[in-house]
């Protein structure tokens, strides 16, 4: 299997399976001298960790990360950073009934056809369990971005099923299990999830992620545009079926006079473009949204077939998230951080000495 790495200067490579011994990652390209301990990563890992609320999977993994290399006396050395998280709460027997069955909507069929075999225990490498290492690597990037360049990244759930956030209160995001910014909708979310779990079904969600303090100039046109790499990274998250930058698909109904971000010496008047113009960061906040499909691991019976091509009915056992979007916020933050970190280092390598006479614009 290829495709386990992302980035050019800041490179993150992950390994491991859902029910394997451990998950791990290697980070190449992190600058030396960054103060780094396990605690710097643990906060975001705890935000993603399973079993923390009644709305997520009952699988309980401590997700305690260990630094294996690349850090000496509390600081990064500039060499490869090795990270490891052990799996401790696997129940592989829960998946014995699908050993020879393909779960509709999952990667079972495509993995079998591509590799001639598959790890049926929790989906193996295709499981979102792998994203724990992305979150750990993203936490390293987030610390460097904030500490050295004052770039901050935050995400929130903007929609769960039919329930949309109508107000954005950033102080609310970490105060509830949904990472939802609208406190007036929490009761409705709780009731909706209760009924959903009773029915044995699942639901999709929309996650928004924003980066502030991003300098103008990040992005490498033509094929390594900043928004293209952000979309690539976010689309690589399990269950993501759509990505928007700025107004995204909303631009279809906009007129040019409405969607352009007017500017003056005092700054931009709007940010319909989501902080990227011509594939290069404009200095405005980077704004992206992702749509996550409902998980197909549900207890509602569904038609499928066996590995031998015979018709069969599938009921997925095991412990699963009724809405995978609930734990996707720190994952989306991590992927955006990894892309920005990579592009920041690439920009520094080529354009560090560039001095433009044009004033840098902010938001009015």
UniProtKB/Swiss-Prot annotation:
Gene3D superfamilies: Chorismate synthase AroC. Transmembrane segments: none annotated. NCBIfam families: aroC, PRK05382.1. Residues 41-60 are annotated as: Disordered. Its EC number is 4.2.3.5. GO terms for molecular function: chorismate synthase activity; FMN binding. FMN binds at residues 125-127, 238-239, 278, 293-297, 319. Belongs to the chorismate synthase family. Its cofactor is FMNH2. This reaction introduces a second double bond into the aromatic ring system. It comes from Shewanella putrefaciens (strain CN-32 / ATCC BAA-453). This is Chorismate synthase. The keyword Coiled coil does not apply.
């Amino acid at each position: 299997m290829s495709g386990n790495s992302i980035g050019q200067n800041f490179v993150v490579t992950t390994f491991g399976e859902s029910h394997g011994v451990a998950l791990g990652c290697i980070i190449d390209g992190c600058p030396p001298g960054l103060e780094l301990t396990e605690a710097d990563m643990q906060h975001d890992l705890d935000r993603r960790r399973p079993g923390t609320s009644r709305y997520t999977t009952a699988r309980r993994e401590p997700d305690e990360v260990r630094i294996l290399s690349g850090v000496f006396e509390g600081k990064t050395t500039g060499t490869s950073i090795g990270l490891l998280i052990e799996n401790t709460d696997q129940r592989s027997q829960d998946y014995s009934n699908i050993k020879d069955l393909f779960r509709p909507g999952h990667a079972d069929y495509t993995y079998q056809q591509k590799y001639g075999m598959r790890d049926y225990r929790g989906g193996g490498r295709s499981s979102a369990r792998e994203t724990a290492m992305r979150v750990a690597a993203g936490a390293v990037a987030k610390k460097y971005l904030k500490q050295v360049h004052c770039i901050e990244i935050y995400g929130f759930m903007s929609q769960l099923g039919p329930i949309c956030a109508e107000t954005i209160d950033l102080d609310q995001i970490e105060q509830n299990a949904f990472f939802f910014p609208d406190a007036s909708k929490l009761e409705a979310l709780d009731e909706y999830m209760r009924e959903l779990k009773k029915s044995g079904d699942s639901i999709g969600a929309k996650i928004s992620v924003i980066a502030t303090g991003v300098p103008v100039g990040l992005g490498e046109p033509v094929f390594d545009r900043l928004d293209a790499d952000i979309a690539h990274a976010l689309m690589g998250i399990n269950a993501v079926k759509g990505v928007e930058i700025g107004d995204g698909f909303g631009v279809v109904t906009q007129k040019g006079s409405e969607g352009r971000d007017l500017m003056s010496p005092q700054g931009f008047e709007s940010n319909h473009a989501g902080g990227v113009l011509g594939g290069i960061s404009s200095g405005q906040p980077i704004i992206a949204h992702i749509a996550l499909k409902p998980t197909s691991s549900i207890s509602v019976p569904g038609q499928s077939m066996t590995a031998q091509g015979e018709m069969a009915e599938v009921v997925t056992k095991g412990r699963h998230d009724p809405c995978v979007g609930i734990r996707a916020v720190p994952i989306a933050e991590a992927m955006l951080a990894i892309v920005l970190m990579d592009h920041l280092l690439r920009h520094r390598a080529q354009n560090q000495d560039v001095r433009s006479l044009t004033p840098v614009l902010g938001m009015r």
